[in-house]
Regions:
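A short core secondary-structure module
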Residues: 46, 50-97
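C-terminal helix-coil-helix/basic helical segment that borders enzyme active sites and/or dimer interfaces
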Residues: 167-170, 191-255
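Glycine-rich phosphate/cofactor-binding loops in nucleotide/flavin-utilizing enzymes
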Residues: 133-140, 144-148, 239-296
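A short, Trp-centered hydrophobic/proline-enriched beta-strand micro-motif
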Residues: 16-24
Length: 296
């Protein structure tokens, strides 16, 4: 099954012809993902799926979904989960409802399954072994992202704001020792993360998995991102306050009430509050490091 799925999907994914969304989190099953309730019952050559997924990024534009479903209720929670593919987001019984974020964006959704059928052949790995597949995938999701290019770009944005904004009417914000110190701390965090990322890339090129280092990367990357967002909003002050989500839409050409950077600073700040939660909260990542790396 796995090899057929690779042949069917991987070339189209690489070519950018199809997009998958990820069906993991559920209402009440986020950080405690193994408690998920979405059920798949075998019916001949199909699974019949009922339940719901939430915070599903891009479900409204995706072609397919990979998701975790419960196929057994006995034993440990982790032992009754399977990893399946949904061939089409237009499958009968599958409904996508938007969730608009605090920033006014539609990025995430709630997905409902009402007797949705998917072939048993779309299962990845053995039945009831989906937890192992999901953990492997999350290891690369946390450690496979290159945080530093985005963080360096964001750092330069904040520096540019600080060079242009006055501080209490005397000089520029960039010259304020306290603010400059926090910028320097953020840059050190990024440089440290960059070294870790390069080490992980080196390991991957040798066929090694990132292991618990991926949890360290996720913690440092997401917390540094939030630190920069906070500095950006602080530097812009009231310029970051206006709520103009339409100004960030493709094709919008009306004048805005604040400078360009003021349009994105607060939405980034609000959206990235979730960076320390998704893909496994940072508290969970610290638990993983404590158990797997430190043996605590």
């Amino acid at each position: 099954m796995l090899f057929r799925s690779k042949a069917k999907y991987l070339p189209a994914i690489v070519a950018g012809d199809i997009v998958f969304c990820q069906g993991y989190s559920e209402p009440g099953s986020g950080s405690d993902l193994a408690s998920l309730k979405t059920r798949a019952v075998r019916d001949g050559d199909d699974y019949v799926i009922n339940g719901t997924k939430i915070w599903t990024t891009g479900a409204h534009v995706a072609d397919h979904m990979f998701c975790l479903v419960r196929t057994a209720a006995e034993g440990k929670q982790q032992d009754g989960i399977s990893f399946v593919l949904i061939d089409s987001m237009k499958t009968p019984g599958l409904t996508v409802k938007p969730i608009v974020t605090l920033a006014g964006d539609h990025e995430v959704n709630q997905v409902f399954f009402d007797n949705v059928r998917t072939p048993v052949a779309n299962r990845i790995g053995p039945e009831n072994a989906g937890w192992t597949v999901a953990k492997y995938l999350l290891e690369f999701e946390r450690g496979g992202d290159a945080y530093t290019p985005n963080l360096y770009a964001r750092l330069e944005d904040v520096r540019r704001i600080a060079r242009e904004e006055a501080a209490d009417g005397s000089g520029r914000l960039i010259a304020e020792p306290a603010f400059a110190e926090r910028l320097a701390e953020a840059e050190i965090d990024i440089q440290t993360l960059e070294m870790i990322e390069l080490q992980v890339l080196s390991d991957l090129s040798r066929g090694r998995n990132p292991g618990t280092v991926s949890s360290s990367m996720k913690i440092r990357g997401s917390e540094t991102l939030q630190k920069l967002d906070h500095l950006g909003v602080e530097a812009l002050a009231w310029y970051a306050a206006p709520f103009e989500p339409e100004a960030r839409q493709l094709g919008h050409n009306e004048p805005t009430v604040v400078p360009e950077m003021g349009i994105t600073a607060m939405p980034l700040y609000l959206n990235n509050r979730a960076a320390t939660i998704y893909a496994g909260s940072n508290e969970i990542q610290r638990n993983i490091i404590a158990k797997a790396a430190l043996g605590l």
